[in-house]
Amino acid sequence: MNVTKPATQRPKLPSVGRLGLVDALAGAHLAELGWTEHDDQAHVDLLWSLSRAPDADAALKVLVRLAENPDTGWDELNAALLNERSLRGRLFAVLGSSLSLGDHLVANPQSWKLLRGKVALPSHAALLESFVDLAEEVAAAPASAVHRLRALHRDHVLVLAGLDLAATVEDEPVLSFTVVAAHLADIADAALAAALRLAEKTVCRDRTPPRLAVIAVGKCGARELNYVSDVDVIFVAERADPISIRVAGEMMRVASSTFFEVDAGLRPEGRSGELVRTVESHIAYYQRWAKTWEFQALLKARAAVGDAELGQRYLAALMPMVWTACERDDFVAEVQAMRRRVEQLVPADIRGRELKLGTGGLRDVEFVAQLLQLVHGRSDESLHVASTVDALSALGEGGYIGREDAANMIASYEFLRLLEHRLQLQRLKRTHLLPEFDDEEAVRWLARAAHIRPDGRHDAAGMLREELKHQNVRVSRLHAKLFYQPLLESIAPAGLEIAGRGMTSEAAERQLAALGYEGPQTALKHMAALVNHSGRRARVQSVLLPRLLDWLSYAPDPDGGLLAYRRLSEALAPQSWYLSTLRDKPTVGRRLMHVLGTSAFVPDLLMRAPEVIQNYGDSRTGPKLLETEPAAVARALIASAGRYSDPLRAIAAARTLRRRELARIGSADLLGLLEVTEVCRALTSVWVAVLQSALEAMIRANTPEGGRPLARIAVIGMGRLGGSELSYGSDADVMYVCEPASGVTDAQGVKWSTAVAEQVRAKLGTPSVDPPLEVDANLRPEGRNGPLVRTLASYGAYYAQWAQAWEIQALLRAHAVAGDAALGQRFLLLVDHTRYPPDGVSAEAVHEIRRIKARVESERLPRGADPNTHTKLGRGGLADIEWTVQLLQLQNAHEIEALHNTSTLESLDAIAEAKLVAEDEVKLLRQAWLTATRARNALVLVRGKPTDQLPGPGRQLNAVAVAAGWHNDDGGEFLDNYLRVTRRAKAVVRKVFGS
């Protein structure tokens, strides 16, 4: 019979499982160390200490290796571990956190003693002395220099890591991030000093070494260094002679091979520039050539080692330039470019795991601090500090950001840097990448190394995931708030509680200018108008604006966007859903700011079709803007207009739905949700629906009650309407064909149909706040001089006898779009004999087309237009591509039925399939048509009115680039691509036309 032993007789030693050891050999390892032979309290405490190591199995394996090494003095170490809690905390924490430091201890088995007793971090002076003394000692024995200096460096990192990590295992004091980062910089300084001394000995031997100062920049300069980091330096010499250059180069070589990578890439001209310069040479460069980012780098400059007087002279000369960098003409453009570069550096698939460059990551915090320092440091010396933590504190104290916000940002920054330190310690490798979130073992290790404990609802790994999410969200929110909240405080009325007040109006204007606003005073007035009134709206706006303004600052035209947002907010003030949607759905707000800051066309539509804003969000299937089918909109538009007997009300109803659909299409286009071909088809669909609605309304208005229409009417779409390739600024090119009702003469039917067609054109063309609805019938036989409406027989007779080359060419894009469908199809069958004659068009007609094309190129381009950048009539533009396709259709459609197509793009496919033009040349034509169409659409979206000419370099061209879907807002880059694409296409056009 089994009897349970009394508690007093149970073994005290915890089992391997209770200790959390999962390695199959863990039990054997414990026995090998002799830790399972006794069950006294000392051994129990020892084992529980081991269990708290971030990776207890890894720590145990290194302990076994130490025990096996005769140089360790295992008996002494074992006794110390049993009796000294602080040693256990430091050693177990290090061995469970860093495989590399474990290897260092095994290779240097007496170094464990550095973690014993009352351990304190050595001073900067003591570190310098120990490293330089060793450098002097090993200079005579260079063979051992690297090993001994590296071991000294690792020993100091070991001591720091032991103190930094000890609290994860035992109740030991916690070192602050600032202490750890500053001490790492002190170690780096000492290592640089040792490398410099060795370099001087190697290069100069017994001669006096040159006066050389090493300026630390980056994290080392700011004394906020990582455990593993490149050390960025700039060299300053009294004379930039070959000896100084050799000493600097040798110092970099020694340091990089012994301690860490030394990088001089931030020097003037970067890696292409001289390694060493004099103070005067530095001054000349920064006065004349330096970019904004180079001044930003100098924010953290510090004379680290070498000639102290020379280093201070360098700083005294250069730092005043740093604090006036914001006055430079290109400051704003370069700041915006720096922001874009940060975002584009990280591949999308790892962005969520990137501590440094990901959204809500370390670079977001550092960018905020540095930009605000550059903007306001000119007039406030309290901001002349180097480290990110000190800068945020100073900004809070100075009223440039809220004190609480500064404290929160510092806390988030220090947490993210803590994780970065732990990740780097593991293998002493430079990394900023979090483990895969579903890698349970790796996430749990990181959580334990960062001293994150379970809370009852989550284990340590779960707590880390939650904390990361919280910190990233907080940084992202504060990133916007720190830029804009103080601006609101500077203009808010006394009765509106936003936060503390501090920033002057001049400082607010400087900050807005740095964030991309060309009219900062006007922008402040708009902001004041949004928050300076009583009630809930002002309070909600004060909460929303920091985030909205941050998103808006990334748009090409934040000034125009802010004005549009103010107008929209004032117009929608009675709509309760508007502000609550922006508050509760960040995706809607972000997309709206992009649209408002890019386009003049869509905001005007949104003022009268605000419900489209509610579709800026996402559903489970994707963006709501794409849930609407153009065909469904067309049916709804026709049905809505059909409910009214009054033609004006019918057309007003059609305009309302068209307005909403244009707002939807334009929004989706600007947000990159639609391809250009989808945009063209959707715009064509809504135009056709408007034509159908207007035609039906006018037929009803001209038909007596109880009577019947005197004729059937079909509307034939021509040009881009016929090809379903309309753009935002396109008119509707049409022809009308009628068929009199039975008992009605042709003359009566034509007269009645002409009245209907005239009314359609007039009513749709009535001036309106909406984009115009111009109906153009000038492509009909005889142009403006010909009858507006003809019967089928009249068309047949005319085309059989009188058709001119341009009229035949125009028929290539004829397509029945509205009115009587059967009549429209009969018209198309009739004109097929003209546009696709059995034997092809005559050589005279082809010659005439070529002659007209040459005349168009020389005469139709507007006066003053640039032929290289006119999207419609310019070199390689839309007209060039379309005329080329139409010439090939005229020459070959009688033999190739696939060319019986009104679409330019689909006809290009047929041309390639039939090998009428080489496939690579067809690709050039297609690319040019798509590029020009995107650009032409973008011009309307940006300017708000039809135009075909690309603007010159500047903000408007940048906006066109963004609206056209270019991958950034670099208008110059976009324009270069446009010119390249159209130039290549023009060569193909000339080849086809034989010119």
Swiss-Prot record:
Q: Which GO terms describe its biological process?
A: regulation of glutamine family amino acid metabolic process
> Which cofactors does this gene product need?
Mg(2+)
| Chain residue ranges for the region called Adenylyl removase | 1-487
- EC primary class: transferase
Q: Where is this region: Adenylyl transferase?
A: 492-995
Molecular function GO labels: [glutamate-ammonia-ligase] adenylyltransferase activity; [glutamine synthetase]-adenylyl-L-tyrosine phosphorylase activity; ATP binding; magnesium ion binding
Q: Specify the domain of life of the species encoding this protein.
A: Bacteria
Report TM segments: none
Catalysed reaction, written as an equation: [glutamine synthetase]-O(4)-(5'-adenylyl)-L-tyrosine + phosphate = [glutamine synthetase]-L-tyrosine + ADP; [glutamine synthetase]-L-tyrosine + ATP = [glutamine synthetase]-O(4)-(5'-adenylyl)-L-tyrosine + diphosphate
Quote a single Gene Ontology cellular component term.
Answer: cytosol
Q: What is its EC number?
A: 2.7.7.89, 2.7.7.42
Q: Which Pfam families match?
A: GlnD_UR_UTase, GlnE
Q: Per UniProt, which keywords does this protein have?
A: ATP-binding, Magnesium, Multifunctional enzyme, Nucleotide-binding, Nucleotidyltransferase, Transferase
Q: Which family does it belong to?
A: Belongs to the GlnE family.
The role this protein plays is: Involved in the regulation of glutamine synthetase GlnA, a key enzyme in the process to assimilate ammonia. When cellular nitrogen levels are high, the C-terminal adenylyl transferase (AT) inactivates GlnA by covalent transfer of an adenylyl group from ATP to specific tyrosine residue of GlnA, thus reducing its activity. Conversely, when nitrogen levels are low, the N-terminal adenylyl removase (AR) activates GlnA by removing the adenylyl group by phosphorolysis, increasing its activity.
Q: Name the chain's protein.
A: Bifunctional glutamine synthetase adenylyltransferase/adenylyl-removing enzyme
Q: Which organism is it from?
A: Mycobacterium ulcerans (strain Agy99)
The record lists the lineage as: Bacteria, Bacillati, Actinomycetota, Actinomycetes, Mycobacteriales
